[in-house]
Regions:
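Surface-exposed loop/turn motifs in large extracellular/passenger domains
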Residues: 1-77, 83-110, 116-141, 147-168, ...
Length: 528
């Protein structure tokens, strides 16, 4: 077949490869010297034939089954497909499958659901790739797709139930677009990555990252572009010890990964350092992103990506323990709209915006339940370009309409309904500036309400005290000034009302409504 023509060396059947016992595949000297045979690398396992460059049917078979077991050692890579040949492309059936099962053993290289330089199925033959790891060790990474190039014309399912992966797990393939003859890797339909099985005693360990997308290629379509695919990328963690979880792809300075459809990340349990809804280093998913936390222990959760942008992000905290939640991205990237909803669980600090860099357009934060210490409508040290919208229906320690360390915001909106809160600030915390703040208090128990920020300036503040019991109300900020403050006392029960700021900060004009007197005295305080 290596010198044949299209259709030569085709197997109409299903190869079954079992490697167990103490078997060792590959001579390390040949591997280190990059020795090849008819273009195939030494020490690797291929689920079908080698094939020939430029011919997808040579070396093909209908399906592919590979099982790695016992104390077997694979000194290089495992491919569900061939070197050049594509699984199922010559099948008389309109479907094909690839099953890779790792029960135990040691794989020095990586595992690919597709082939080295080709994929599985065709535009008229739907392929399904299943990779299941129950134990053993993979020193490289696990890819649902192909290596250098190739399209999986169907769905990829990656299930890591146990064992240890030294590097990362990808729902898609590795290779990215280089030129027209090297277009990279594609998975046309859905991606389903599941880490851990709560019914089993095994706990998988992923020492680097889990990606729903590819390293550098495309998922949810057989071509890349700006359209939104109906296919989805789903990542579910039921248990496991993982450094990073990404709903999207990886990327680098050379390659941009594409996720063409919507992304869904669901954490049901596990110990995870960072959860990202989007991409890692490059690229923006075409669809929307949903991250749902039901349980587990997580250090940081981001609706967006690491150094990347996103369209609309949705983060739901239903349970578990999370140190910080960001509706936006981490280091950089623009997020159009972020939505964060807390219905349960525990979170120390919840942000509507980005963390260290980039911007968010509109942020929407809703706290209905859970143990939340501090809420920011904005980000940690980032700006919001349109508005922040914070609604509190539960007990919270401190609420800021704006950002923390820095960042500028044109409008912040806070609505508090029947909640118990220590401090409410319309503005930022330690830096940056908010132009206009709006606070509406509707039935609550609050110690302090500040129209402005804490050590952060505000232009205009608007505080509406409709209902509730409040100890102190300041039209301005805390150690921070404002140009104009507007306080409407409404029907709330208030002990002290100050038109200006607390401790320090200049306020040029104050307006307090629904008092028996009218004042413009910046230092005025009223006891009701």
């Amino acid at each position: 077949g290596s010198t044949g023509n299209e259709g030569d060396g085709t197997l109409n059947g299903t190869p079954y490869i079992y490697i167990g016992g103490t078997a060792t595949i590959g001579d390390k000297n040949l591997i280190s010297n990059n020795t090849t045979l008819f273009g195939a690398e030494s020490g690797s396992v291929f689920g079908i034939g080698n094939g020939r460059s430029g011919y997808s049917t040579i070396g093909s078979s209908d399906n592919s089954i590979i099982i790695i077991d016992d104390k077997a050692t694979i000194n290089n890579n495992v491919y569900g497909g061939g070197n050049y040949g594509a699984t199922g492309v010559s099948s008389s059936s309109n479907t094909s499958y690839t099953n890779i099962i790792i029960n135990d053993g040691f794989i020095e290289g990586s595992v690919y659901g597709g082939g080295n330089k080709n994929g599985s199925g065709s535009s008229s033959k739907t392929a399904t790739v299943n990779i299941t790891m129950n134990g053993g060790n993979v020193v490289g990474s696990i890819y649902g797709g192909s290596n250098e190039k190739g399209t999986i014309y169907g769905t990829v399912n990656v299930n890591i139930n146990g064992g240890e992966v030294t590097n990362s797990v990808y729902g898609g393939g590795r290779g990215g677009y280089t030129n027209s003859s090297n277009s990279g890797t594609f998975v046309r339909d859905d991606i389903n990555v599941v880490i851990g099985d709560s019914s089993l005693n095994t706990t998988p360990i992923i020492n680097k990252s889990v990606y729903g997308g590819s390293a550098y290629g495309t998922v949810n379509d057989s071509s890349s572009g700006n359209n939104v695919s109906s296919s989805k990328t789903k990542v579910t963690v039921n248990k496991g010890i993982i450094v990073n979880v990404f709903g999207g792809g990886e990327g680098n300075n050379t390659y941009t990964p594409y996720v063409m459809g919507d992304i869904e990340v669901t954490i049901n349990n596990g110990t995870i350092t960072n959860v990202f809804g989007g991409n890692d280093l490059k690229g923006k998913p075409n669809g929307n992103i949903t991250v749902t936390i039901n349980d587990g222990t997580i250090t940081n959760t981001y609706g967006g990506g690491n150094e990347t942008s996103a369209n609309t992000t949705n983060v739901y905290l239903n349970g578990g323990t999370v140190d910080k939640i960001f509706g936006g991205s981490n280091i950089s990237g623009t997020v159009t709209t972020s939505n964060v909803t807390a219905s349960g669980g525990t979170c120390t600090t919840l942000y509507g915006g980005n963390n260290a860099g980039g911007t968010t357009g509109v942020t929407n934060v809703l706290v209905d339940n859970g143990n939340i210490t501090t809420v920011y409508g904005g980000g940690e040290a980032t700006s919001v370009t349109e508005s922040t919208n914070v609604t509190i229906n539960n007990k919270v320690g401190t609420v800021f309409g704006g950002s923390n360390l820095s960042g500028n915001i044109p409008i912040t909106n806070i609505v508090v309904n029947d909640a118990n809160i220590n401090d409410v600030y319309g503005g930022n915390n330690q830096g940056g500036k908010v132009e206009n703040t709006n606070i509406d208090i509707n039935g609550t128990l609050i110690t302090n309400v500040y129209g402005g920020g804490l050590k952060a300036e505000t232009t205009t503040t608007n505080v509406n005290l409709n209902y509730g019991l409040i100890t102190n109300v300041y039209g301005g900020g805390n150690e921070a000034g404002a140009i104009t403050t507007n306080v409407n006392l409404g029907g709330a029960n208030i002990i002290n009302v100050f038109g200006g700021s607390n401790t320090s900060g200049e306020v040029k004009t104050t307006n307090i409504k629904n008092l028996s007197v009218t004042t413009s005295d910046l230092s005025s305080a009223f006891t009701i």
